Amino acid sequence: MLRAEWVEKRKRFKNKTQMHLARQGIITEEMEYVAKREGLHPEFVRQEVARGRMIIPANINHLHLEPMCIGINSKVKVNANIGNSGLASDIPTEVEKAKVAIKYGADTIMDLSTGEAIKETREAIINVSTVPVGTVPIYEAWKIAKGNVKELTVDLILDVIEEQARQGVSYMTIHAGILREHLPLVQHRVMGIVSRGGAILAQWMAEHGKQNPLYEHFDKICEIFKKYDVSFSLGDALRPGCIEDATDDAQLAELKVLGELVEKAWKHDVQAMVEGPGHVPLHQVEFNMKIQQEWCHEAPFYVLGPLVLDVAPGYDHIGSAIGGALAGWAGAAMLCYITPKEHLGLPNVEDVKQGVIAYKIAAHAADIAKHWPGARDWDLAMSIARYNFDWNKQFELAMDPETARAYHDETLPQEGYKTAKFCSMCGPEFCSYKISQKVQEKVSPEELIENGNWVAP
């Protein structure tokens, strides 16, 4: 892949975005690359990007990035959040987290660093990442302002956004949808505002008595994004922090504004996706996906989980993957992973691995439910390998081959058992596969009976 050459050829364009080029009728090399990865026609990809239903987050300065897409008419994607805090982690650790996330299948990563050396950490992550890197620039601005609302100026925020764009960040969470008039709507909530960026901007508005500066200066942000092809990830500052607060007036009021901002970004030919909850009980997940598609004009929906219960700290990657699978089936384009450390602390490298795998499971389950072409081929190959006792093939096909092999080795470590027609669960006498194969040898195909014409959905 020679992305440097692709970008160089397009230097004459003032607006560098994939959306702008798509609307000019141009099928870019990034679109062709994405089409091959997704099994789609390049012209279809161009149409989806032009329409805004698909984004290709690919900053022109992240030249070793392998283009990917996020959209309702593509495979469900997974994002992994990494980044330091003021109390823990360092650059080598965050780089290792990035590598592990990518190894286990993260489609994008976000650097959410809030501690020391934010710029240097981000640079190191971008340098090792072959997937798009996202950020939340208000964090760095808040760090520079030392948590002082008076020092958090519009110029500072815009300078941080421009510097991050210049560095190669492909998408940024911009909390432009939370407005001053929304603040009274959170008073009844159990957990108020749980978005860090949202809380910072709420404090800014409350103390200045002014409107959200990201909303007021949205056009200026669009001008920056056009130069570097940065995509908006329109932040849900008022996402619910517990299922009790789900789908309330505050969340929905902000969602309507996000829909307006999508159209505003599109007027600049800037790509945009919309962030979503959060904490949502299972029976409300589908509604949340459908209303976003309606109000946000089918811009890709990027959801955090959602968690469908609040009582499983230490296992929130499981509780949220349940919601994520349903969300992906109902229309979410990308799932932001949650790790076992959610609500408890900063994830370590192993937590990142566990979170990514949980969400790759959720995304794949959603692709199967959506009847995505070829999605079930992987599962069919695994099933055939299982029934044929091809243990090494099973390990090879597993989402986490090392763990699958290690679990088998716990009781049957010798290499000879990798061709055995049983495992330690049933042993050679109780293996249903083995018994079933013997039955099949004795039953003639002519003995099959007609069983109706019903077809599974």
Swiss-Prot record:
Q: Which cofactor does it need?
A: [4Fe-4S] cluster
Quick one: which residues bind [4Fe-4S] cluster?
Answer: C423, C426, C431
Q: Does the keyword Zinc apply?
A: yes
- Broad class of enzyme this protein falls into: lyase
Q: Does the keyword Secreted apply?
A: no
Pathway(s) where this gene product acts: Cofactor biosynthesis; thiamine diphosphate biosynthesis
User: What does the record say about how the cofactor binds?
Assistant: Binds 1 [4Fe-4S] cluster per subunit. The cluster is coordinated with 3 cysteines and an exchangeable S-adenosyl-L-methionine.
Q: Which UniProt keywords apply?
A: 4Fe-4S, Iron, Iron-sulfur, Lyase, Metal-binding, S-adenosyl-L-methionine, Thiamine biosynthesis, Zinc
**Entry similarity comment:** Belongs to the ThiC family.
Q: What is this protein called?
A: Phosphomethylpyrimidine synthase
Report the source organism: Aquifex aeolicus (strain VF5)
- Lineage of origin: Bacteria, Pseudomonadati, Aquificota, Aquificia, Aquificales
